[in-house]
Regions:
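Sec-dependent N-terminal signal peptides
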Residues: 3-11
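Kelch-like beta-propeller repeat domains
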Residues: 12-304
Length: 304
């Protein structure tokens, strides 16, 4: 499908808010992801302090400020997005091994039985991708596949039928992007073309109803290895890296106005981090405080 042009009027405004610290992760992990199910934050996979892929998974209760370990993933994964559809948590694809091999697995977490179960695999292996949820379906965009080649094809999973189908390709293929769903669209934000020296500020929005992409206002900074979460209808985009440094940037996109604001920076700059919003607050979890392989157990909480 062709990319539809929009009239873009860049605007970057300053925002307010404050950060505080929450209970740290039980162990330092980078390249992990997070999602919210029943007002609790789940994280799974990542790269641990030994530099190896991990299968560990944890659940955080914001009300109690407490982490607990849940069932391990069936296999170690990193750069694996998590997403929730209805009452179900999904872990999508990801990378395995220190050599970053892409995988096609789709797992769901059975909260009642504390176990992970397989579902129909992705049409092709992919990791370092982004996932958004619209109309009860997973929309997977970007990332790289076999041979460390960028993937343009988008894929949509319907839990009701346990089937995947193709969708319009992302106009700017990239890995290490972040994705978030808001107002019926999936926003693909930032990332890079396999090269941390060439980070993107690109924002493209996918509409499942029309199977079309549109370009939106660019992010104020160029970042890959970043995270995003939707809080009060706005998309908060946090962290990231270049080849030699990490970002504390915290920028907020309003889908209703197509405008960005710059919010209070992260207390601990990092990449490969996870983000989730619950209870009117933004939680930023783990990641790497140095470019490349590094890990932190820090959990920072932003209250607008």
């Amino acid at each position: 499908m062709r990319l539809l042009p929009l009239l873009l009027i860049p605007a970057v405004l300053e925002g307010d808010g404050r950060w505080s610290a929450a209970a740290p992760l039980p162990e330092p992990i980078q390249e992990l992801s997070a999602a919210v199910l029943h007002d609790k934050i789940y994280v799974a996979g990542g790269i641990d302090r030994t530099g190896q892929a991990t299968a560990t998974a944890f659940r955080y209760d914001p009300a109690a400020n407490h982490w607990e370990r849940i069932a391990d993933l069936p296999s170690p994964r990193h750069h694996m997005p998590l997403a929730v559809v209805g009452d179900t948590l999904y872990a999508v694809g990801g990378l395995a091994e220190p050599s970053f091999v892409p995988e096609s697995t789709l797992w769901l977490y059975r909260e009642d039985r504390n176990r992970w179960e397989p579902r129909a695999p992705l049409p092709a292996p992919r990791g370092a991708s982004g996932v958004g949820v619209v109309s009860g379906k997973l929309v997977v965009v970007g990332g790289w596949g076999a041979g460390r080649q960028l993937i343009a094809a988008s894929a949509i999973y319907d839990p009701a039928t346990d089937r995947w189908h193709g969708a319009a390709p992302i106009p700017t293929p990239r890995d290490h992007l972040t994705a978030a769903a808001a107002r019926g669209l999936v926003y693909a934000i930032g990332g890079r073309p396999l090269n941390p020296d060439r980070n993107y500020d690109i924002v493209e929005a996918y509409d499942p109803a029309s199977d079309r992409w549109t370009r939106r206002s660019a992010m104020p900074s160029r970042r890959g290895g970043l995270a995003a979460a939707v809080l009060d209808g706005a998309i908060h985009v946090i962290g990231g890296e270049t080849r030699g440094s990490v970002f504390a940037n915290h920028e907020v996109y309003d889908p209703a106005t197509d405008r960005w604001t710059t919010a209070s920076a992260l207390p601990v700059a990092r990449h490969g981090l996870a983000a989730a919003a619950v209870g009117g607050k933004l939680y930023v979890i783990g990641g790497g405080p140095k470019a490349g392989f590094s890990q932190t157990d820090a959990v920072d909480v932003f209250a607008p």
